[in-house]
UniProtKB/Swiss-Prot annotation:
Residues marked Cleavage (site): R349, G350
Protein localization: Virion membrane; Host apical cell membrane
Protein function: Binds to sialic acid-containing receptors on the cell surface, bringing about the attachment of the virus particle to the cell. This attachment induces virion internalization of about two third of the virus particles through clathrin-dependent endocytosis and about one third through a clathrin- and caveolin-independent pathway. Plays a major role in the determination of host range restriction and virulence. Class I viral fusion protein. Binds to sialic acid-containing receptors on the cell surface, bringing about the attachment of the virus particle to the cell. This attachment induces virion internalization either through clathrin-dependent endocytosis or through clathrin- and caveolin-independent pathway. Plays a major role in the determination of host range restriction and virulence. Class I viral fusion protein. Responsible for penetration of the virus into the cell cytoplasm by mediating the fusion of the membrane of the endocytosed virus particle with the endosomal membrane.
Membrane-spanning intervals of the chain: 534-554
Keyword Secreted: no
Signal peptide: 1-18
GO MF, one annotated term: host cell surface receptor binding
Extracellular face of the membrane: 19-533
Cytoplasmic compartment spans: 555-570
Protein name: Hemagglutinin
One of the GO biological process terms: fusion of virus membrane with host endosome membrane
Membrane topology of this protein: Single-pass type I membrane protein
């Protein structure tokens, strides 16, 4: 009998320290905080920034046909002031305008300036075709000191038509041009507003002046308005330039009797390009696709916080300076006690800790994968990553950044220049609209990242649960869960046995008999906390009942012997 008790006690002692296999996940001592739909500041193992803040303070022009207009304004390439002589015809896929650039020489302005500027920025350059206009009875060599080359001159692409003699009669004229090309033609003309009525009479003769322009889609009449104005470049007169896009096979007709600045050549757009206003230096050693006034944004990120006004293939501008995208699982740093694997922690929390609700701590040493196993048996302790579950999670997380980029990237146009009086109202609307769009996209960006982060954390927890269920289904009744991500195995499980559990090749039938015997032996000597509680409550109840019975018996004896009297009053 004594021998049996000794053997049973020895067995109980051995299997309290039974072989174990635990499941866990990778952790780091210092993770990165991200926001999800339901919670802010969740720490994850890995995360990547989605907002670009690094600016290249140069115009990266490598691989591009770049035209730096310098002192020439972009609109000047159409009419031809002296500073634009080398850009009357050009080809480019990147057009750079400088702050010093000027569109005109004789003072004046363009009608619908910003619309024309946007057209030319995207033009890919321009080429010209002579319109074939000839004139009789007038002078075609009007010039001004405001447009100097070696001497007084005029716009290279325009003709300043004057009376044949000072104060002479300017004949009524009609000129037409048909666009025989397969692409639209840009037609530009001017209306001269003299500095005084006397000057207008000297240049174009007496009488009222009227200029009418029409095509199939356009009709407009202009009346010059002579009068004194502040002098600019020594001139008190002004020239207002007007333009239209003439469709193929359409004809434009000009009817005039003076004060008309006639077009000499029609302009044709070459293709496609980007145009940027910037004083940043050109750099042919770097490549870029996104530009702004301060330089180039080179980034594969979906968002940027550098400039709200950009052109090209650019990240979306958002107000946030940082939006972290989770690319790893929720981080639960390993507790110091788990690093030491003390006997106390083994007994209280299981061997290695855990995550995902039932696993309390991660493993900082698990560097080969996101998920893995740790085991303890007679041969010692070991750690191994689970590559299949790791790869499954990585495959689903990879591409999150690219998907964000696909949802957000598009070409943007830069509208950030001077507006005339009417266009200032449009400009205010554009600026208000842009600000509203920024607000919306800042919210959208935060929402998109939060959704992806929520999905990542839920996904990685799900993979952990799948791995746990795979082990539980293999072991069945051969092991018992300890509630901390570990399984206490009721048979001897060497390293090969542990490997079979990890590889999903474990044969529970092979160890079933040994496991059942050991489970019975353990249950015979080890009471669970539930049974202990039941016995304690039963014992307490029995003691109370016995005490009450003794007390009642004593009272009954005392009353019977007359030692105690009970009086009931009504």
């Amino acid at each position: 009998m004594n021998t049996q008790i000794l053997i049973l006690a020895t067995s109980a002692f051995f299997y309290v320290r039974a072989d174990k296999i635990c499941l866990g996940h990778h952790a780091v001592s210092n993770g990165t905080k991200v926001d999800t739909l339901t919670e802010k500041g969740i720490e994850v193992v890995n995360a990547t920034e989605t907002v670009e803040q690094t600016n290249i303070p140069k115009i990266c022009s490598k691989g591009k046909q770049t035209v730096d207009l310098g002192q020439c304004g972009l609109l000047g390439t159409v009419i031809g002031p002296p500073q634009c002589d080398q850009f009357l015809e050009f080809s480019a896929n990147l057009i750079v305008e400088r702050r010093e650039g000027n569109d005109i020489c004789y003072p004046g302005k363009f009608d619908n300036e910003e619309t024309l500027r946007q057209i030319l920025r995207k033009s890919g350059g321009i080429k010209k075709e002579n319109m074939g206009f000839t004139y009789t009875g007038v002078r075609t060599n009007g010039e001004t000191s405001a447009c100097r080359r070696s001497r007084s001159s005029f716009y290279a692409e325009m003709k300043w038509l004057l009376s044949s003699t000072d104060n002479g009669i300017f004949p009524q004229m009609t000129k037409s041009y048909k666009n025989t090309k397969k692409v639209p033609a840009l037609i530009t003309w001017g209306i001269h507003h003299s500095g005084s009525t006397t000057e207008q009479t000297r240049l174009y003769g007496s009488g009222n002046k009227l200029i009418t322009v029409w095509s199939s889609k356009y009709q407009q009449s202009f009346v010059p308005n002579p009068g004194p104005r502040p002098q600019i470049n020594g001139q008190s007169g002004r020239i207002d330039f007007h333009w239209l896009m003439l469709d193929p096979n359409d004809t434009v007709t000009f009817s005039f009797n003076g004060a008309f600045i006639a077009p000499d050549r029609a302009s044709f757009l070459r293709g496609k390009s980007l145009g940027i206003q910037s004083d940043a230096q050109l750099d042919n050693n770097c490549e870029g696709e996104c530009y702004h006034i301060g330089g180039t944004i080179i980034s594969n990120l979906p968002f940027q916080n550098i400039n709200s006004r950009t052109i090209g293939k650019c990240p979306r501008y958002v107000k946030q300076k940082s939006l972290m995208l989770a690319t790893g699982m929720k981080n639960v740093p390993e507790a110091p006690a788990h690093k030491q694997l003390t006997h106390h922690m083994r007994k209280k929390r299981g061997l290695f800790g855990a995550i995902a609700g039932f696993i309390e701590n991660g493993w900082e040493g698990l560097i080969d994968g996101w998920y893995g196993y740790k085991h303890q048996n007679a041969q010692g302790e070991g750690t191994a990553a689970d590559y299949k579950s790791t790869q499954s999670a990585i495959n689903q997380i990879t591409g999150k950044l690219n998907r964000l980029i696909e949802k957000t990237n598009q070409q943007f146009e830069l509208i950030d220049n001077e507006f005339n009086e009417i266009e200032k109202q449009i400009g205010n609307v554009i600026n208000w609209t842009r600000d509203s769009i920024i607000e919306v996209w800042s919210y959208n960006a935060e929402f998109l990242v939060a959704v992806e982060n929520q999905h990542t954390i839920d996904l990685t927890d799900s993979e952990m649960n799948k791995l746990y269920e795979k082990v539980r289904r293999q072991l069945r009744e051969n092991a018992e869960e300890d509630g901390n991500g570990c399984f206490e195995i009721f048979h001897q499980c060497d390293n090969d046995c542990m490997a079979s559990i990890r590889n999903n090749t474990y044969d529970h039938k092979k160890y079933r008999k040994e496991a059942i015997q050991n489970r019975i032996q353990i249950d015979a000597v080890k009471l669970s906390s539930g049974y202990k509680d039941i016995i304690l409550w039963f014992s307490f109840g029995a003691s109370c009942f016995l005490f009450l019975a003794i007390a009642m018996g004593l009272v009954f004896i005392c009353i019977k012997n007359g030692n105690m009297r009970c009086t009931i009053c009504i």
